[in-house]
Curated annotation (Swiss-Prot):
Organism: Parafrankia sp. (strain EAN1pec)
A Pfam family annotated for this UniProt entry: Ribosomal_L35p
HAMAP family for this protein: Ribosomal_bL35
One GO BP annotation of this record: translation
Gene behind this protein: rpmI
Name of this chain's protein: Large ribosomal subunit protein bL35
Family label: Belongs to the bacterial ribosomal protein bL35 family.
Length: 64
């Protein structure tokens, strides 16, 4: 059976850690930042782990 290909859009949006957790970026930090507080934008910097509900689907798209 041939290898599964990674879904390229998913590959660009998610990162797999060494322990196998899937990390994602937070929304609301791309544009229209003028009216958002510094505190709010600062809290959106970090990547967060993907929710367990989405894990299986994203793993399949990442061919893992």
């Amino acid at each position: 059976m041939p290898k599964m290909k990674t879904h390229t859009g998913t590959g660009k949006r998610f990162r797999v850690t060494g322990t196998g957790k899937i990390m994602r970026r937070r929304a609301n930090r791309a544009h229209l930042l003028e009216h958002k507080t510094s505190r709010r934008t600062r809290r959106l910097y970090d990547e967060v782990p993907l929710s367990s509900a989405d894990n299986r689907r994203i793993k399949r798209l990442l061919a893992r």
